[in-house]
Amino acid sequence: MVLQGCSNNDNDDWLKYHQQLGDALNSTPVENTEPDNIPSFPETQRLVFEIEEMREGMLNIYALRGCQITSLIAARNNQLGKVAPPSQQWLYERELWQQLSSCWNTDTPEQLSEENRERLLDMTMSKTAQLPYVSWNAVFESTEWQKSFSRASTPLSSTTLADIDPALEALDYLRRMTLHQFDRQWEQDSGRLENHLKELNERPLSAEILRALLLASQRLDEASLMLEQASAECLPDWDMTGVQQLENVAHQWLKAVNRLVDSHPIAPPAAWQDYQHNWLSLTNDEAPWRIFNSALNRHQAMRSQFTVCPE
């Protein structure tokens, strides 16, 4: 029996385990049920913040040319700049903040008229206040991030459990870029940022991991039901390699996602807070991670009541 929506390899592993138990217990394996899919990812507008555009005319900007922001703002205001992806808007806004902040901390303001000095201060304070929200939007508005949680996915295959290191590096870079957003000495790298986002775009990894946890929980509960009905005294040894790999990979990934979110110094939108709590939490008993751990612990406890059959 192959379940729709799951890779054959994963189903085969669980079916083999159920069959192994059935043979040892001299019983028929329980009927397998397909676990529910993960929910639809929240709509973009519910995940991002509205950022007010800067409304300074180019003549006023030119008056601040000593801050070297004229060409930067002109590039942002042209047609290509207005349709740039969120990641490039993030780079632009951070560079603009760096220029304004650096300029304010030089003797340039003293050379400006009072009106232009006030304008420079207002722009600097405005961009300082906006940058954390721009940083958030850059991640959560990106197609790469949203694709990671796509329902059009399958549970993470046991053959690809070891292939998540590049994606973990991508999350770590986004986290470090967020942590250093107000560090004028930290140099951003457009090519590196885009390569990491490209890595996240390769596959819906968050969805694959969540669905793998749901599948494992379902199969473990089914196996536990078989043990509840058993009269045998011993069980064959259980190779837990695949389960332990899933446990390790899922914990690594969910921890990295939560660390990235927590690196932002602002309260996330309510829609994200709900999704994170219900699906990505490592502490919520009703989230996939804790459900999986409970199912695994319950099954191991039931197995411990049996001796290991001699080979």
Please report, for each region that a protein language model flagged, where it lies by residue.
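C-terminal motif of bacterial Sec signal peptides marking the signal peptidase cleavage site
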Residues: 3-5
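N-terminal Sec/ER secretory leader and immediately downstream segment
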Residues: 10-159
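Generic hydrophobic, helix-prone segments enriched in Leu/Val/Ile
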Residues: 17-21, 100, 213-225, 275, ...
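Cysteine-centric signal of extracytoplasmic or virion-exposed proteins
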Residues: 67, 103, 234, 309-310
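Hydrophilic extracytoplasmic domains
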Residues: 251-311
